[in-house]
Amino acid sequence: MKSIVFVALFGLALLAVVCSASEDAHKELLKEVVRAVVVDKTDAVQAEERECRWYLGGCSQDGDCCKHLQCHSNYEWCIWDGTFSK
């Protein structure tokens, strides 16, 4: 009887240690994912600030849009300006 209780308590202690280690690994993985998402968003914002806006991209003035596009005054997105050239 004593040995069964001892084995059960030992099993519970071992399970607690394994779960704790698993939870720590899960937290570290979650931190890495959040860091990756934040870095990707930061890089995307910087890229948008450096580059022109493509067709239907948000804008506030014509200079925000790429070549042959203009900023639509009502909807504030880049639309084709009607010109053709190379």
UniProtKB/Swiss-Prot annotation:
Residues 1-21 form the signal peptide. Its main location: secreted. Expressed by the venom gland. One of its GO terms (cellular component) is extracellular region. The keyword Transcription regulation does not apply. The presence of a 'disulfide through disulfide knot' structurally defines this protein as a knottin. Ion channel inhibitor. This is Omega-theraphotoxin-Hhn1f 2. It comes from Cyriopagopus hainanus.
